[in-house]
Amino acid sequence: MEAYKEKIKEKLSVVPFEPGCYLMKDRNNQVIYVGKAKRLRNRLRSYFTGAHDAKTTRLVGEIRNFEFIVTDSETESLLLELNLIKQYQPRYNILLKDDKSYPFIKITKEKYPRLLVTRTVKKGSGKYFGPYPNAYAAVETKKLLDRIYPFRKCDKMPNKLCLYYHIGQCLGPCVYDVDQKEYDDMTQEVSDFLNGEDKTIIKNLESRMQAASENLEFEQAKEYRDLIQNIHNLTKKQNIMSADNTARDVFGYYISKGWMCIQVFFVRNGNMIQRDTTMIPLQQTPEEEFYTFIGQFYRLNQHLLPKEVHVPKNLDKKMIESVVDTKILQPVRGQKKDLVNMANHNAEVSLQNKFELIARDESRTVKAIEELGEQMGIQTPIRIEAFDNSNIQGVDAVSAMVTFVDGKPDKKGYRKYKIKTVEGPDDYKSMQEVIRRRYTRVLNDGLPLPDLIIVDGGKGQMSVAIDVLENELGLDIPVAGLRKNDKHRTSELLYGPAAEVVPLKKNSQAFYLLQRIQDEVHRFAITFHRKTRQKHSFTSALDEIEGIGPKRKTTLLRTFGSIKKMREATLEDLKEAGLPEKVAESLQKELNKED
């Protein structure tokens, strides 16, 4: 038995039957998964005994150690789990990232508030309204309010009047003493409007329109009429989801084939204005996954707490209340129950659609590799490794390898190589070096061998790869070449001793797969080459400057990223990056000389 398995077995025997959290670690001692359990020993033992689905099998295959923390209750475990996920960001946990955020309108918490569109919710910095279905809806609403209410626009108070004052869209608090009550009343009207109360604002505009008409200011009256119409268009009811205007989020979920789909409806002013769908591979019980999800949803992510949160009846209300600081309801009848049922049903539909799309994708990719193997006369290439070289006149020469498994990219299997033994532009020798390095490592480390190797190029590249594999390493792996046309697009696949063209139809699934492989390996190689060249040119420019050694070069590279940005930096910027004043002055002088 491997040493780590023996160690895990020993640790399992002393885990208590108490609630708590556990942290799974990989060979690098990195936390790759955080979970919680009512009984720690039972849950941890379950990972290392019996059969698992593919997702859990992958996780268990990477575990080399674990830690656990005992808590007094399940509630405490849930809170601790959320904190540990936030701290370690484990890759096997479903992490709700900030890029899945929604637009809000914000009234800032200032003496003279501003009106902003934002995707970031910062507690205590103002009042937020939304979320809006998209940025366009939020921006259009703000534009409308800007035309009606002269809110301050400047981030910092200027010392002179800006354009907005002169066009009547700001009261000019930067220069004039603006009546605080007038500004507060205006803020309250906007707040009421954003909360769904549009009667006050319409009444206000109708009064202005009437006054303008009586004064024969017909252009002004027409503008007020258009604003009233815009408000009606903006606030007209869609499908009424609720009879009242209470802001509420409605949660539902569905489980199938080891996956959980959670659906959230955002209901504002009686309308469903947005929804959120999240797919989760189950590692815990569905209920535990839900508690973790909803905790992340509001605590770790940019979601504004509504007045009410509605959840299915079968969940533990107290567990949810421990991580969500608002009113939790579990409707049992009426319209609110119908909303929860609708969220559950939509979760089911979303999950079934996901499975159907996966099945179609699997069908296409399996068909592609089967067709490829058949046309080449080899066994179906389950694992394909493809290589491409990149350099400019032999300078900063690099190579890259991508891996496709079952016709799909396996990014864990991607590799990058800096060419070490080749002088000048020699594509054949570069390919020879990389093939030798890759498959020597594969043999030494007992890694899986590919069913097919694809090199970018023709007979020459194929020949040097085959020579290394067969004559140096004793490996018999099919090697094919991918040739491009004059437009640099995939043209044909070459295979066999004479590097003959494999008869593939251009519209076949196999040819589409080859195009994807060639594009991906080219992208990966080019990106690596650009980064290598940029780093090399960056460090070369600093070689002649006294006082800048390897460590300072690295620091400058991380701070500025390019010579151009370093040239634009002030003396203070360079000093903040850790350079002594004299060295910073020398650097500025040298860089400006190059200019």
From Swiss-Prot:
One GO cellular component term: excinuclease repair complex
GO BP terms in the entry: nucleotide-excision repair; SOS response
Keyword DNA damage in record: yes
Xref: Pfam families: GIY-YIG, HHH_5, UVR, UvrC_RNaseH, UvrC_RNaseH_dom
Top-level taxon: Bacteria
CDD domains referenced in this protein's UniProt entry, alphabetically: GIY-YIG_UvrC_Cho
One GO molecular-function entry: DNA binding
Subcellular location: Cytoplasm
UVR domain residues: 199-234
Cited SUPFAM superfamilies: C-terminal UvrC-binding domain of UvrB, GIY-YIG endonuclease, RuvA domain 2-like
Domain GIY-YIG, chain residue ranges per copy: 17-94
Record keywords, A-Z: Cytoplasm, DNA damage, DNA excision, DNA repair, Excision nuclease, SOS response
InterPro entries to which the protein is assigned, alphabetical: GIY-YIG_endonuc (IPR000305), GIY-YIG_endonuc_sf (IPR035901), GIY-YIG_UvrC_Cho (IPR047296), RuvA_2-like (IPR010994), UVR_dom (IPR001943), UVR_dom_sf (IPR036876), UvrABC_protein_C (IPR050066), UvrC (IPR004791)
Family in the record: Belongs to the UvrC family.
Subunit structure, interactors included: Interacts with UvrB in an incision complex.
Protein role: The UvrABC repair system catalyzes the recognition and processing of DNA lesions. UvrC both incises the 5' and 3' sides of the lesion. The N-terminal half is responsible for the 3' incision and the C-terminal half is responsible for the 5' incision.
Name of the protein: UvrABC system protein C
